[in-house]
């Protein structure tokens, strides 16, 4: 199993959690028993870019903290399997502000949103209370395993 994050920072904020995100992604892939090579794209963007994406793809004029776009592209050949989950767009300026508002550390806020987004890429959603609770439990389990507490 190989878990890869393709990373691009287009925001003006220095990002210090990529190493942690790689650990998170690897642990999540192990816990969910995903086999083969798996990857996702992670892009940090400005608030302006985030707002444009929200308008274009969600038809809502707001600045999101994170947007997830599932792909589920699977390339399978003899003895090889590559699974591209999709793209995650994070807005660091919004996430930092949110962390302060919620009284969380920036590490906690970034990590929570990253794990939550990966589960969206894997097909989890907030369709009802039961699936919402399951997703929240999975997210918290990953964070607790890495010592990232509220």
Curated annotation (Swiss-Prot):
The keyword Cytoplasm applies. One of its GO terms (molecular function) is RNA endonuclease activity. Keywords: Cytoplasm, Endonuclease, Hydrolase, Metal-binding, Nuclease, Ribosome biogenesis, rRNA processing, Zinc. This is Endoribonuclease YbeY. Its EC number is 3.1.-.-. Binds 1 zinc ion. GO terms for biological process: rRNA processing. Its main location: cytoplasm. Belongs to the endoribonuclease YbeY family. Single strand-specific metallo-endoribonuclease involved in late-stage 70S ribosome quality control and in maturation of the 3' terminus of the 16S rRNA. It comes from Mesomycoplasma hyopneumoniae (strain 7448).
């Amino acid at each position: 199993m190989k878990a890869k994050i393709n990373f691009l920072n287009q925001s003006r904020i220095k990002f210090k959690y990529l190493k942690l995100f790689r650990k998170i992604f690897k642990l999540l892939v192990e816990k969910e028993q995903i086999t083969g090579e798996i990857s996702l794209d992670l892009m940090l963007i400005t608030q302006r870019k985030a707002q444009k994406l929200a308008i274009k793809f969600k038809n809502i004029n707001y600045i999101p903290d994170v947007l997830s776009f599932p792909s589920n592209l699977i390339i399978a050949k003899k003895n090889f399997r590559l699974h591209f989950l999709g793209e995650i767009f994070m807005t660091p300026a919004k996430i930092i502000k949110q962390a302060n508002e919620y009284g969380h550390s920036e590490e906690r806020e970034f990590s929570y949103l990253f794990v939550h987004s990966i589960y969206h890429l894997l097909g989890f959603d907030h369709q009802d209370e039961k699936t919402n609770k399951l997703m929240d439990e999975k997210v918290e389990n990953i964070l607790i395993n890495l010592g990232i507490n509220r």
